[in-house]
A protein has these predicted regions:
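Catalytic-core region of carbohydrate-active enzymes that cleave or remodel glycosidic bonds
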Residues: 375, 408-501
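Short strand-edge motifs at loop-to-beta-strand transitions and within beta-strands
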Residues: 100, 142-144, 638-640
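Aromatic- and carboxylate-lined catalytic core of secreted/periplasmic carbohydrate-active enzymes
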Residues: 84-94, 109-113, 451, 461, ...
C-alpha cells in the first residue's frame, strides 16, 4: 500500500512540476500544425509516462544487460613460418584480397575426375598457412582460386591425393602480393567477418561493414550482361551485398559433377566474378533450390531413417568442398539454401521431416566451414518469423533464453559452431506499432551473433516504396544491422509467383497488372532502391554500430498516440536516432500509411541530461535531405517533447548532445 501511495504521489508531483519546466521551443516550422493545447497535453503525458517508466525500470530492472558475448571460432589458417621456395616453377603478381586463379593440366586421365582425385594448394606467407581446395574444371584441368590477405611474398605447393601424378602434385610457385590499389572497401579492408564478436559485420581489419543487400534468387536465369548492369547500378545506389540463389542455374549437383555441368558452372563463375569486380559481397545459397536436397540424398545412398546415410553424407561433403573451391576466394557470405532454417516448411513440401536434430543443411554448414580457409560468415536462410525465429518458443533448443516470441520455433542452427549470424525473414507491419517481440528475440537471444532482416516484402510485389524503405529503417534501429531489399522483377527474375493476385501491405495496393508489367529494368529505378542508399549515408554519419535499440522502453521515448517509431541511441544517449511516421490521410495511398489517426505528431524523448543542451535535425528518408539544425534544452526531468514533424510522411530525427 505504501508503495502504491509513493507512486501516486510521484506522478502527481511530476504532472504539477511539468507545467513549470516546459522547455523553450526554438522557432522553427516543425512546431506548427498541432494546436498548442494538444502539444502541451502531449508533453505533460510524455513527462508523466517517462518518469513512471524510469521508476519501474529501477524497481524491476530491464533486459538491457542480457546480451551474451558472441563465441569467436578459431581461424582456419594455420600459424606457419615456412621457408621460401628457392626455384618456383612460376611467379605471379597479385593484390591483397583480390581473387587469383591458377590452372593445372593433368597428364593422367581419370575415369571419374570429380570422384577419383582431389588437389589442394598450400599457400604460405607472413606467418600463415592456408590449405585451399582446388576443383576439377572439365577435361584434365584442375584449378585453384585464392586471395592473399596481406602484402609480401607468398609461396605455394600443390598436394594431390594421387601423389604419383606429378602434373598435379608438388607443383610450386611464388606470389608477389602488393597492397590493393583500387576503390572498393571490400579489398581495402578485407573480407567480411563476424570474428570481431560484435552484433554487426566487420571487414577483416575491424572496420564496421554496412550490410545492404539486393535480392536475386534466380541468379541462374539472369544473363551475364544483366548482372553487370545491375551491379553497376546497385553500387551507385549504395548497395553492398548481392543476395543470390542458384534458381535457373544450368548445372546439376544431385548426382555427381560431370562434363555436362561445365558450361553452366562457367556461366555462374562469370557472374561471381562480375559481382566481385564491382566490390560487392556475394551472399549466396549453395548448389540448387532447397527441394533438390531430397534427390541428391536419394541418388547417393539415400536415407538411414530420417537422416542421410553415410554415403550420402560423404557426397554432401564432396560437393560442399567443390563449391568452396570455386567461390571462397571471392568476398562471399554462405546462406546454404532457400528457407532451410529450420526445415524448409517440411510439412508443406512432402519431404522427410527435418527438425533440430536431422536437418541435412546442418551437415552442409559444417562441411563448408571445414574447407573455407577464409572463414566467411555462414548462416541459413530462415523461414518467415511466423514459422521460425532466432529462439522463438525455445522448444527443442539446446540453450535457455527468455521467450519473447512464442509464435515460432527456434532456429535449428543455434548449436552449429560454423553458424555465426541469423538470416531472418521478417516483414514488420506497416499499419501498426510493433510489439517488439521479434526484434527482442533477435537482439537478446541471438547468442551475441548478428541478426539481419535478410528477406522482407519485395517492392512492387507485396509492398511499394514506403514499405521497402520502412523495413530497412526498422531493421537497423532495432539492432538488426543488415537489410535485404528486393524488387520485382529482380528478386527472382522471370518468376511469376503471386502475379495473378492483387496485394496490399495495408498502406499500398499492388495490382496484378502492376506485377505482370514489372521488368528488371524497372526494379533498378524503384524509388526505394535509392532511398535505402540515403538510409545508409545517414546511418554511416551517425556511427550506426554504436546505436543500441531501446524498443518499448518508455524511459527513452514516449510516442504520441498512433505514432509508429523505431528508436536507438548510443550508450550514454548522447546520439539518438528515431524513425517516425503517422498520417491523417485515410486513403493510405502512396504517401499515407496507416488507417489510424496519428497526424504529424511525434512524442517525448527521455533519459537526457537534466537541463542539458542538445541539437537536432530532421532527415527526409524519401529524398535524403536534412532540415536546419535546431537547439533545445531538456527539462529538469531529462525529457524533451519533439512536437510536430515538418511534413506528413515518415521522417527521421537525429538528436545530439551539444559539445
Amino acid at each position: 500500500m505504501k508503495f502504491k501511495k509513493y507512486i501516486s504521489l510521484l506522478l502527481c508531483i511530476s504532472v504539477i512540476l511539468s507545467f513549470s519546466v516546459l522547455p523553450s521551443y526554438a522557432s522553427n516550422s516543425n512546431q506548427a500544425g498541432t494546436p498548442a493545447i494538444i502539444n502541451t497535453a502531449e508533453e505533460i503525458t510524455g513527462i508523466f509516462v517517462n518518469c513512471f517508466a524510469k521508476l519501474i525500470n529501477r524497481i524491476k530492472g530491464t533486459d538491457e544487460t542480457a546480451i551474451p558475448s558472441a563465441t569467436i571460432n578459431p581461424h582456419s589458417w594455420i600459424e606457419y613460418k615456412g621457408e621460401p621456395i628457392e626455384n618456383p616453377e612460376q611467379t605471379l603478381t597479385a593484390e591483397t584480397w583480390v581473387a587469383n586463379e591458377i590452372a593445372f593440366e593433368s597428364e593422367k586421365s581419370y575415369a571419374s575426375p570429380f570422384n577419383d582425385v582431389d588437389v589442394e594448394l598450400h599457400l604460405w606467407g607472413n606467418g600463415r598457412l592456408y590449405k585451399i581446395p582446388a576443383f576439377w574444371d572439365g577435361g584434365n584441368i584442375w584449378k585453384v582460386r585464392f586471395a592473399c590477405p596481406s602484402e609480401g611474398d607468398w609461396y605455394f605447393r600443390t598436394v594431390c591425393t594421387d601423389a604419383e601424378n606429378t602434373s598435379l602434385d608438388s607443383r610450386t610457385g611464388k606470389v608477389i602480393c602488393s597492397e590493393y590499389s583500387g576503390e572498393y572497401d571490400i579489398y581495402k579492408h578485407g573480407f567480411v567477418t563476424t570474428n570481431a564478436g560484435n552484433k554487426y559485420f566487420t571487414y577483416d581489419d575491424g572496420t564496421p561493414f554496412f550490410y545492404l543487400g539486393d535480392t536475386h534468387w534466380s541468379l541462374g536465369d539472369e544473363t551475364v550482361d544483366m548482372v553487370k548492369t545491375i551491379c553497376e547500378k546497385r553500387v551507385s545506389q549504395g548497395f553492398t551485398v548481392y543476395q543470390s540463389e542458384p534458381i535457373g542455374a544450368k548445372f546439376d549437383f544431385t548426382n555427381g559433377i560431370t562434363e555436362d555441368d561445365k558450361s553452366g558452372l562457367a556461366d555462374y563463375d562469370e557472374k561471381f566474378r562480375i559481382i566481385a569486380e564491382n566490390g560487392l559481397v556475394h551472399a549466396n545459397a549453395q548448389f540448387f533450390f532447397s527441394y533438390y536436397i531430397e534427390p541428391l540424398i536419394s541418388n547417393n545412398g539415400g536415407f538411414n531413417g530420417n537422416e542421410p546415410s553415410d554415403s550420402a553424407k560423404a557426397y554432401l561433403e564432396k560437393v560442399s568442398r567443390y563449391w568452396v573451391a570455386r567461390y571462397s576466394a571471392y568476398p562471399v557470405i554462405w546462406t546454404l539454401g532457400q528457407e532451410v532454417d529450420n526445415d524448409f516448411y517440411w510439412s508443406e513440401t512432402n519431404h522427410p521431416e527435418w527438425g533440430l536434430e536431422n536437418n541435412p543443411y546442418k551437415l552442409i554448414a559444417e562441411y563448408i566451414a571445414k574447407y573455407d580457409v577464409y572463414d566467411h560468415p555462414l548462416s541459413a536462410h530462415m523461414e518467415n518469423v511466423g514459422a521460425t525465429s532466432v529462439y522463438g518458443n525455445g522448444k527443442g533448443a539446446t540453450d535457455e533464453c527468455k521467450v519473447y516470441f512464442k509464435d515460432a520455433e527456434p532456429s535449428c542452427f543455434r548449436d552449429i559452431e560454423s553458424h555465426n549470424f541469423y538470416a531472418v525473414q521478417w516483414h514488420p507491419s506497416k499499419t501498426e506499432q510493433s510489439d517488439f517481440r521479434v526484434e527482442k528475440d533477435c537482439w537478446y537471444n541471438s547468442q551475441g551473433k548478428p541478426a539481419i532482416n535478410y528477406e522482407g516484402q519485395y517492392c512492387y510485389l507485396w509492398t511499394k516504396n514506403f514499405g521497402s524503405r520502412m523495413q530497412g529503417w526498422t531493421a537497423y534501429l532495432s539492432g538488426m544491422y543488415g537489410y535485404g531489399w528486393g524488387g520485382h522483377d529482380t528478386w527472382s527474375y522471370l518468376n511469376v509467383y503471386d502475379e495473378e493476385n492483387d496485394s496490399s501491405d495495408g498502406v499500398d495496393t499492388i495490382t496484378s497488372q502492376e506485377k505482370i508489367n514489372a521488368t528488371w529494368q524497372d526494379a533498378l529505378e524503384y524509388e526505394s532502391s535509392y532511398q535505402v542508399g540515403y538510409m545508409r549515408d545517414f546511418l554511416e554519419s551517425t556511427k550506426w554500430y554504436n546505436l543500441i535499440p531501446r524498443f518499448d522502453n518508455k524511459s527513452y521515448f514516449v510516442p504520441a498516440n498512433n505514432v509508429y517509431y523505431a528508436y536507438a541511441g548510443n550508450e550514454d544517449n548522447s546520439e539518438i536516432v528515431i524513425y517516425i511516421y503517422s498520417f491523417t490521410d485515410e486513403s493510405v495511398a502512396q504517401n499515407a500509411n496507416t488507417k489510424y489517426y496519428g497526424g504529424i505528431k511525434t512524442g517525448t524523448v527521455g533519459n537526457l541530461v537534466s537541463n542539458g543542451s542538445y541539437t537536432y535535425q530532421w532527415f527526409n528518408p524519401i529524398n535524403g535531405e536534412y532540415s536546419e539544425e535546431y537547439e533545445f534544452t531538456a527539462t529538469r526531468f531529462g525529457t524533451y517533447y519533439i512536437g510536430d514533424r515538418p511534413q506528413a510522411t515518415d521522417m527521421v530525427l537525429c538528436i545530439s548532445a551539444a559539445d
